[in-house]
């Protein structure tokens, strides 16, 4: 499912402990680490896709987490040119995402990376809230910075001083000049709700 602009609808998941540390996982047979994420099916809402991806990639169920909030509207990133398959009938140039912040309420022993026949990850650990902005693959750093900026006030409401303001090193990690292939963040008002009260333009279905 690709939109007319070439973006595939997708959800991202920031899974957080009570102390503000977040779930960080290594992709199978690759050196790259990232948050759980995945594409939406045609008949799914973002919330439904989030719970499906959560179970597929981490083994966690809805009763193991609490949804603290989500980014309002879509956040986009572009794929690097080498990753775009130009010979496809529908060319995908990137992802448009809704990011969810979840608090782990169950025991972390419930995490199971080989829950499916084709696991996405082979290892995971807890890292500081802003760590992923500096360590995810370069073309995703912009969208990670935007997502975590939106979600930080919600995270601070749970973890308090466990989640600080974005450090300078993270703020600079995604800036133009480091790479091509990601969107430069636009200033958006912070929101504690799931979606804008009035849907304007291209916003996720509820």
Swiss-Prot record:
The keyword Hydrolase applies. InterPro entries: NUDIX_hydrolase-like_dom_sf, NUDIX_hydrolase_CS, NUDIX_hydrolase_dom, RppH. NCBIfam families: PRK00714.1-4 (NF001937), PRK00714.1-5 (NF001938). The gene is rppH. Residues 6-149 form the Nudix hydrolase domain. CDD domains: NUDIX_Ap4A_hydrolase_plant_like. Belongs to the Nudix hydrolase family. RppH subfamily. Residues 175-206 are annotated as: Disordered. One of its GO terms (molecular function) is pyrophosphatase activity. Coiled coil: none annotated. The keyword Hydrolase applies. This is RNA pyrophosphohydrolase. Accelerates the degradation of transcripts by removing pyrophosphate from the 5'-end of triphosphorylated RNA, leading to a more labile monophosphorylated state that can stimulate subsequent ribonuclease cleavage. A motif (Nudix box) lies at residues 38-59. Its EC number is 3.6.1.-. Its cofactor is a divalent metal cation. It is an enzyme of class 3 (hydrolase). Keywords: Hydrolase.
